[in-house]
Amino acid sequence: MSESKQQYLEELKQQLHYHAVRYYVEDNPEIPDAEYDRMMRELMAIEAEHPEWISVDSPSQRVGGVALDSFRQVTHEIPMLSLDNAFSDEELESFLKRAQDRMPSAHIDAFCCEPKLDGLAVSLLYENGVLVQAATRGDGTTGENITENVRTIASVPLKLQGEGWPSRIEVRGEVFMPKVGFEKLNDIARKKGEKVFVNPRNAAAGSLRQLDSKITATRPLAFYAYSVGVVEGISLSSSHYQRFLQLKQWGLPMCPETKLVNGLESVKAFYADILNRRDALPYEIDGVVIKIDDIVIQEKLGFVARAPRWAIAYKFPAQEELTLLNDVEFQVGRTGAITPVAKLEPVFVGGVTVSNATLHNADEIERLGVMVGDTVVIRRAGDVIPQIVSVVKERRKGDENPIVFPTSCPVCHSHVERIEGEAVTRCSGGLVCQAQRKEALKHFVSRKALDVDGLGDKVIEQLVDKEMVETPADLFTLSAGVLTVLERMGPKSAQNIVNALNVAKETTLARFLYSLGIREVGEATAANLARHFKTLEAIQTATHEQLIEVPDIGEVVARHITAFFAEEKNQRVVQALIEQGIVWPPVEELGSEIPQPLAGKVVVLTGTLTQLSRGDAKAALERLGAKVTGSVSKKTDIVFAGEAAGSKLTKAQELGVEIQTEQDLLALL
């Protein structure tokens, strides 16, 4: 048993060495950071149990990473250490207890806390205030000379500002790529047909390690200082945080979220606050770094083989994890779009257990090169739908199966088609397709459409399965007696649905248009159509040229609208609904008594609203004349930011867009 465990330890070492090279040298990691951290923790646990098995080449005895041969090597005068990790409050408390136990006479209560940036660690050497050398961390002892590349980073001062700086000082920090810059860089790459970067860290590392510094100069890199190495000429403050402030006076940027806090509970509060605002920050982070602030205590605590005893990285729950792709199911939406859905071995990621992930379309499957049975990297960040971001092809065993996109609808077996220039494959069956019929009816009765109370998804599915309804108009022919044949449907519930259907007959032209499910016609577009044309008849007979005069309607949407109303079966559906008694007041009357202070304004909602739903807020803003969009641009006039607002708020701040709160919104309404 002991022999097999020692053999497993050797295999674990080899795996960690391999993945360290992929991460640090090739900038092309195969596994998520969380998986690497788990493997390292397992290695260290075995070594703690069997210290006689520890070897000098163990990953636990060094930082990790190898210097590239293509750059001149630099030896660090003081090793650039990595950090140990904590993944829970208990592990954080253990770290602090160990430090206090080593120095029982010291009162360890002040901590310098900062976000853990996801970039590349670098060392900047200044002599007489002038930048003379920049180097990567490398293996902690030897790094690569990247001076010419670092000189291109605007936030790195080539000469220190102010006065009183040491004759020689080494400043350590992180080179990273802000989210906005990363998105722009990838947008340019896509337009050129070039390979895009997987994440900002890879983009930063790849940019910094260019042999041609002219290429680096075109990349949107930034730098934040986080510590000091060699210092000659003067003595710096004995407070880590005060050293930050001194560096800032000399022109070296520090992360604005960095704080000096007192006590364990304040450290936990800092962690919780940064975790809550993670998606809103303009850069990628994967945790927070907690350092004992007193430099004297730091020096006395010292370090272990690969990390200081006075600092720790408190990591966030992983946003990426490894799991197995067990199968792929193909779902059909209301417009016939066929979407491949990955069925995964359940995995806890981003704070929830994930068992399904979108694969988007056939192009995405081909791009990933993914197969059933593969080990895949799954990502879930914030409220984003989980998705597969890469495949660990090195873990293939040979029994994986290719994913075959269907040539006929998986529900109705109609022929599938893919229009040139579109990524989506669609079922051609229309309402003949039971799946499309279900989704079309769910959309028709949804809150933003006809808003039929009590007519939920399960009821719709039963109605279609039992062939009780085929088109939206059929819903209005249902009686309470007929509805009681459905599962869990008593006479009272059935009558409530009939009553709700009768109430829903009185609607607005905008809601009616939206309920029809015309491709690309959302709430805002439907409202614009209603305001512009005033009547259903005018919209039905509008030409392509007339449609593109409507705000928010371009060539593609105009084609979808004309095609919809030109289709004979759609004409019959609309006519049947009118015959069932659906009515709306003249459009002119809707806004005649409502002031429109936001007429012509482009508005964006972001964050969590506590007093009203996002849908209600959007509808109310549109009634006030606003055009509500989903993204922030130079054309945006106002951003209404709720709690935990994310990247949209950050972008608005960068563009100088007017920002208002939920209270401002409520006052306006």
From Swiss-Prot:
Q: Which domain of life is it from?
A: Bacteria
Q: Which Pfam families match?
A: BRCT, DNA_ligase_aden, DNA_ligase_OB, DNA_ligase_ZBD, HHH_2, HHH_5, Nlig-Ia
| Residue numbers binding NAD(+) | 33-37, 82-83, 114, 137, 174, 291, 315
- Quick one: signal sequence residues? none
Binding-site residues for Zn(2+), renumbered to this chain: 409, 412, 427, 433
Q: Which SMART domains match?
A: BRCT, HhH1, LIGANc
Q: Which GO terms describe its cellular component?
A: cytosol
NCBIfam families linked to this entry: dnlj, PRK07956.1
Please report the name of this protein according to its UniProt entry: DNA ligase
Q: What is this protein's gene name?
A: ligA
